[in-house]
Amino acid sequence: MRTGPLPIAVLAAAAFAQSQSPNQLEAEKTFDRKLAAGANDLFTLDLKSDQMVALKLEDQGTDVILSVYSPDRRLSRAFSSARQKGDALEFLASQPGRWELKVAARERNAPASYKISDLKISNPHAPALQEADVSPRIRKITNQAEADAFWKEIGPNGSPLIEPIKDDPIHRFTTFLWRGSADTQRILLNFRNCSPDPVDCFLHHVEGTDVWYRTLRLDHRLRTTYLLTPNAPALAHGTIVDDDLLSQISVRQQRDPLNPKATIWDSEQNPDLPVHRGSSILEMPDAPPQPWAGKRAGTPAGEIVKQDFASALLKNTRPIFVYLPPGYSINAQPYDLLVVFDGQDSIDIVPTPTTLDNLISEKRIAPTVALIVGNVKEMRGTELPCNPIFAEFLNSELIPWLRPNYNVTRDPQRVTIGGYSYGGLAATCAAYRHPETFGNVLSQSGSYWWTPPPDPSKPDIFTPGADPSYVAQLFVNSPKLPLRFYLDAGSMELDRDGDGSSILVTNRHLRDVLRAKGYEVFYQEFQGAHDYLSWRGTIADGLIPLGGKSAGQTQPGSAQMPRRN
């Protein structure tokens, strides 16, 4: 006959059957209780779905078990006072209704004493806010009538709501909004750097109304994108967002229905509903203009020639696009040359040909031929990250093919190679290896956190941040090369892990190294994230200082002037 401690599951089942009349647990109330041998106590809590319960369970020398039952009387959780050691225990209500908490001694024939205290019930998606972090306009909403007036006031296109902050000229209260319905349980803001803890990115609900909101303090020059996820999975503080959870969030996310400004680069190819195409755009009042990115009536347009190019070195074939400036002639003086990556994206999304049309028309750069190099399917992450074979392909196959077929310069000081993200890294490494061909580097949010793979035969397996100074060290260890640089990075391309591996940190490091070595470097930090929305404008910020010498220009030409040393 067994007389020792019972397993928790068995004990919980017995407790359910033998419970006394229930006690209602109350916040800020302490329960000091004694249990006779074989007895147990029953407590109840009326909870809403996804509410989080926290409380302390302490014993007086004999371990007690607190078992949590959902409204359908299923065992949900079980906690041991001995294991908690005075720390708060937490559980999440998976369904609304009356939950039951049963307390019994682990030793079934032993008496016990225990204490329950510090009960707190909260919504995991609604952490407490300081009053200063709430939109002044939202604070005025206390009932549905006031909410109706608010929605009428801001109109159908009123999100995000942007308000000034007293005594803070740099930031603005920026409030993301959602008009809820009876089915709305929670709304997650998918916004780069909203918070290291995703729980802090849930919108808050103004009780008794259909208003959901999340207010952030954001720079008045910011330009970036965001999405909203209605009825995202419930999260608790410290939740690790793994691939499965990320999928659950991604499948629900959509554009902001209250914001008509959106990135819909693939609208013609994407058959999905409009709300699921692209991302919503946040442009703060003083976001710098992007005067060169849009087509202009009356501005002559260049010609784009497309063909496939087979590489013996890489053993593959890719699309390439050659942009010819307006009035291109084989009898003219050789044209400046721009080489960029990512093919069609660098035509449609980052509008390189349109930008060149506008800059050439305004004589901000010399007439320029552009070679836009396409990607081979699934090979971008292998070819672009500082791959010496890819650099050799550019230098020994692609450029030698281009020169006899098009009227382009052989002077490396009039050749710029550039790209964004991995493209910026590829441009830097290609110029480092072949300065006799590429004299200028235009890097937008270059991925200088990259480190070589430990096994060269497996180029996709590496540890980001293992050596975030790798690219900078190449220039430290080499003589000064005949190169000029434009580098940029976004304020939201931050280092969250403290390992120095972010795009912002590694761009600053490379800038400092290059300047210390005596290189001419144009550098700027824009208020934005790692996305096309900023790169559409900053490509001109790089082309003007790097290509302006040929057109008699020496200073950057946009509202955002890169610093020149």
Language model: regions and residue ranges:
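Hydrophobic h-region of N-terminal signal peptides that target proteins for export
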Residues: 9-18
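Non-catalytic extracellular/lumenal accessory regions of secreted precursors
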Residues: 17-51, 124-126
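C-terminal edge strands of extracellular/lumenal beta-sandwich accessory domains
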Residues: 21-25, 43, 70, 100-129
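Short strand-edge motifs at loop-to-beta-strand transitions and within beta-strands
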Residues: 41-43, 87-89, 210-214
